[in-house]
Amino acid sequence: MFDQLESIVGRYEELGELLSDPEVVSDTKRFMELSREEADLRDKVATYNEYKKVLETISDSEEMLGEGGLDDEMKEMLKEELSSAKSQKEVLEEEIKILLLPKDPNDGKNIILEIRGAAGGDEAALFAGDLLNMYQHFSESQGWKFEIMEANITGIGGYKEVSALISGPSVYSKLKYESGAHRVQRVPVTETQGRVHTSTATVLVMPEVEEFEMTIEQKDLRVDIYHASGAGGQNVNKVATAVRMVHLPTGIKVEMQEERTQQKNRDKAIKLLNTKVFDYYQQIELDKQNTERKSTVGTGDRSERIRTYNFPQNRVTDHRIGLTLQKLDSILSGKMDEVIDALIVYDQTKKLEELNK
């Protein structure tokens, strides 16, 4: 472990020099790759440096206690310092083990969040809207930027489908566990008998793809320009600003009309399409390898039921880790930390178990 850590420190110092090299700075792709690598190593190096200081404290305290000639007060102080340092050493060793776990290369990326109303008609579409609000409030609490990319709104205010770009530090690492089927149990607003109905919305979390990672060739792209429409389908712009893009080999389609100009809609559309196409091909590769998608939490199947939101009992249950919280109202208002932290800890614990086998 320590040889690996010394190697990491050496690489971190090398990256610091490379990132100040004008030749590297002028190469955007390489600069971004090296910046990401440096950011990934930063916590490892800082924790290891702290660990070495603690080892030094232990060594110094033991040496002084072994020399003798100390008064009782000094001995007691050194013993307390030694005990505290040994406890800190154990904590840091566990932290280092976790930091050295194989890291998901997408953890530092922004995400495209896609939510679809699935089984349950209008009620499923309304629940998709509830989930969207939950993720938006959570993003705001983290200081992340939340931007609607594409929305297909139903007549009663829900969403058949909605996509959002969430930008900021550690977005993917915290929200990657949200992909899957989310089930709601509640009395719909349209229900006159007061019966509880079950509906489902699906969530897909995709790491945002950088331009240098994925470029769609023009021959594979069809672009349609049309007039943006508002509620009821009426045209709201005299100038055609809405953009529809289709990736011909896969049939993946995106439509963008949120912005006022055609160029801004184009930029957002190509960003969304790049991410969806990249994710499509990545999923095919992972399916071929028959590997779990992204983590050990759940099967990685996008149709897997991962969580139930029970309104009558104010209960949220995450089925993958057996976590039940009587805090539905709080969680739907964006206070998701307890759920997300539990998923991260579970994932890390499972990976450590695999490593120690």
From Swiss-Prot:
Methylated by PrmC. Methylation increases the termination efficiency of RF1. Pfam families: PCRF (PF03462), RF-1 (PF00472). One of its GO terms (molecular function) is translation release factor activity, codon specific. It comes from the Bacteria. Keywords: Cytoplasm, Methylation, Protein biosynthesis. GO terms for cellular component: cytoplasm. It is found in: Cytoplasm. Belongs to the prokaryotic/mitochondrial release factor family. PANTHER family: LD18447P. Peptide chain release factor 1 directs the termination of translation in response to the peptide chain termination codons UAG and UAA. This is Peptide chain release factor 1. It comes from Lactococcus lactis subsp. cremoris (strain MG1363). The gene is prfA.
